[in-house]
Amino acid sequence: MNVQAITSKVVSTLGNKESLIPIILKDGVDSTSLTVKSYKEGGIVEGKDRAIDEFGTQAIWVGGIPFFKKLIDYTAYKKAKLNPGVDIRIIADKEYSKWAKDNAQGIMSNSKTQTVKQAITDCLVDGGKKAKNLYKGKVIAATALTLATYFLLTKGKQKNTKDSVIKNMNEEIKKPTFKGNHSTPAIFKDFENTEKNTTPKKPSFKGLAKSVSEAILFNPVHNMQIIDAGITSERLACSRNKTELAEHAIKEGSFLFFLYGFGGLIEKGINKLADKKFNKPIDLSIDVLMDDTFAKALDKGTVIKDVDKASGCKTPTDKLNFIKNNPDNIFVQAAKKSKIVSTVKHKGKDVVDTSKFIDMKDFDALGENLKNLSNKLAQSKETTKKFLNKTKGLKVASVMANIGISCLFLGYLIPKAVYKYRKMKTGTTKFHVEQDIRNGKK
């Protein structure tokens, strides 16, 4: 794999709004920096407490949903004889599902023998009711089980921290000292009573089904937002004192804002700057910008013509037929490069995978972006190669800037804000929960 291919892969992944990789990267920076800061400012006990919470949460957060979904795929779906690889959005749309079934070709990507046509046909039995209900149950169950797993982690972490503090206190008492008059630590005076206050209220998952919308069901990033909201709620509910509650509010609120909101604002701002100041639109996927076929089409001036060929499509079905029947059209090729259209092998050729949903809003937006880039090239006095090289450079810079700015806030400013608040509130950056345990408050 050459440098261009590696660059394309990295930038494409980090700049993909549907990908979990950039979210995992930002969360990793956040978790690592907070853990290091906890060891430095709060001490060993808090460092361990934070490490279990942050990295344990990340493992559950990233692995929980996929694990439980796979478990349901291998159990409930297998029993129902339905292929989980068929996009449920297709089954939910009668017109789309008919087109998908009638135009299906090739073998399902998650099967060695089952055809795309058979997989779709199976899911359409009983009008797709069985498939839709099974899918909804799968997402709800996977989400609830993931949140329940985090709840168990939280209880285990808090017990581990308390046990560690008590162990340290016992060792301190056993150490010989020249000072007499040892007083019994408060925690041992009324140990049973403190236990009553350490058990957080068990979170309720009632009504979860009602709160899950289609956007959450069908989008892995939105699904993660529900997980984050649940984890944030549990962290706040299980806070061991008011200071920890406020710290969680600062940390979690900032994390969710930068993770899901600020990244999009940065991207829009950089894209607008590139278009206005440098006359280089960078809305297109890096995979499209680095494609030689696309570069040749730009050079020949055929991009706008190819996009306009789809303008005669009156209905979504017309557009679907256009995509299927025009594999050499640069607009269609760009849609495949942008992951808007999925493909599957059939008789040695890449054909449209009709089991995967094609979002027409994304397809139409791609057409506008292709025309915009082509028009900007025509207005410039640069060669196609020079124009594209500058555009690709700006695209790479925009993605890296987005990730970099978010990591700066999550990895430096937010941890600093948390401990600044703690010092302002308690007069020290030391672990207040440890002190509460020593004083018998927890």
For each feature predicted by the language model, list its residue ranges.
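Glycine-rich, hydrophobic membrane-spanning regions of integral membrane proteins that mediate transport
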Residues: 1-442
